[in-house]
Amino acid sequence: MDPKKFSPKLLFQIIVQLISGANKEGYNHALVKVFGSRLKDMPLKSSLCKIRQRISFKFFEDTFLDLLKDFEPQRRTFKSLCIYSIDGLQMTLPRTNNIVDAGYTGRAVSKYRESYMPRMYLTHAYDVLSGVTKAFKYHTRPDEITDAVNMVAMFEKNSVCLYDRLYICARLIRAHIKTGNYFLFRARAKGVKKEVQEFFNSKRRRSSYVFEGLTIYLIKIKNQKTKKDDVFSTNLPPDWVTKKTIRRLYTLRWGVETSFCELTSTAKIQQWHSKFLNGILQELYAMFWVINYTKIQMYLRQESTTNPLNSKYSKPNFKLIFNWVKDRMGKILNKTRRVLDGMKWLIKISKEKREHLSRSYRREIKGPASPYPYNNTVWNII
């Protein structure tokens, strides 16, 4: 095939088919799915690999952002607030000269040693109500606070972001003050402002303090599983700061953890098909596009009458529907009419009733990242 006739749009279709393929289905399967009866126009695998290097991942990024932009008017809110959650993920990359030269190295396992395979550190902003990725950042080193600060600036004023204990810091609070939106941190006892530390050690159940003109509320809520108090810090309006509302609102943060399972286990994102950073990023943006596309189509076919803070809810089987969409990706990219007609039926038959916090398991750590002891942990080191 003449490289001059090979457009970024055509490459996007091939990469989507490539990452959507079953196990051991590589370039040739993806090319056959895209070209179909036009096999004489199909490039060789070696030619495609060379063409991939000429097309920047920025085209894939723009396609991902265009999908989000089109979906924006239809997003779900709760009491006029968008609800986000931010967390980080560590991904393994192939070890090649191109990736190492880009600054990606292994994870430190001691003072003088690091793992052989390079790591990419991903920070993910997730819309917990719509189930869609709002934004993500990637780096050669873990820097989730900086990523969160940059992403908060992209959020709407009528939004709240949920964080775990890592994120509570003055820098991130200032970012929310500047943007004018809300936050909800699960607080930690050390490495935080003096007012938060004193509240941890006191017998008070509620408190507040002023930080650079902003009133921040502190509340203790007993964890029914661990029988210990969790402390939360927020700038939400006072009528929101109740035990029931804060606990159920923070429970929604688990959606971002589930999204990482979908990315690594369901979508198998770490099964890369390139040895170059540009190719890795092409696949990363393409996979987020496929996941977002599936989530959006599911969202548009479901009623949104339930309160998201209810402890009981129903949810369809994402893995089933994701694989069903992957099998039809060629027709979807070619804009075949009525190709998704069966999705509503799949949502109906796979939907299950669930309940937040109905089950809990102690963490298992097989490869500790720190020499310090972990609380509430089962050690299972082989």
What are these regions (language model features)?
Residues 58-74:
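Short Lys/Arg-enriched helix C-cap and helix-to-coil transition segments
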